[in-house]
Amino acid sequence: MISIEKFEIFGREIWIAVFFEEKIDGVTFSLDGCEYLMERINSLKALLERRNVSVNLAEEKSDYPKIVYNVLVGDIENQDALRFLSFRGVTPFEKKVYEVLTKKVKRGSVITYGELAKMLSTSPRAVGNAMKRNPYPIIVPCHRVVLKSGLGDYTPKREYKQFLLEIEGVKGWTS
């Protein structure tokens, strides 16, 4: 099923969509309206299906979008929201990366790909690949992983990464 809800944050609309069965299978969002959200939903659906996670597009009301929003605004700690994630279709390595990132890199801070890789005894490229395939943005805070030389990329838009970090009060990485 999918649950979609619109919220407001820092004077902007944010649309949050969550695929779920018993737990969250995937999250996507848009700061650019409902039409762009539909593009993001299709991208997430394709990612989940490539990972053999069955996706049902039937809309059903759920508390999950509000939970994601509460993580976004800091009312729920990221690590406390891990229990809502199914981790279906996620590799054991990706799950480890997501859990370490979520538990170790707190709201208001960032970590470089290299630093996170060192914590996990792996390569920065492997960490980057896991971040790119993260089906749980906002809850698993891949936006907090930055390049040594600057902000770095973010799917769907670099501007979204900057906005998420600004919401969290991160200074110096958002300009």
UniProtKB/Swiss-Prot annotation:
SUPFAM superfamilies: Methylated DNA-protein cysteine methyltransferase domain, Methylated DNA-protein cysteine methyltransferase, C-terminal domain. The active site is at residue 142. Keywords: Cytoplasm, DNA damage, DNA repair, Methyltransferase, Transferase. One of its GO terms (biological process) is DNA alkylation repair. It comes from the Archaea. One of its GO terms (cellular component) is cytoplasm. Involved in the cellular defense against the biological effects of O6-methylguanine (O6-MeG) and O4-methylthymine (O4-MeT) in DNA. Repairs the methylated nucleobase in DNA by stoichiometrically transferring the methyl group to a cysteine residue in the enzyme. This is a suicide reaction: the enzyme is irreversibly inactivated. This is Methylated-DNA--protein-cysteine methyltransferase. It comes from Thermococcus barophilus (strain DSM 11836 / MP). The gene is ogt.
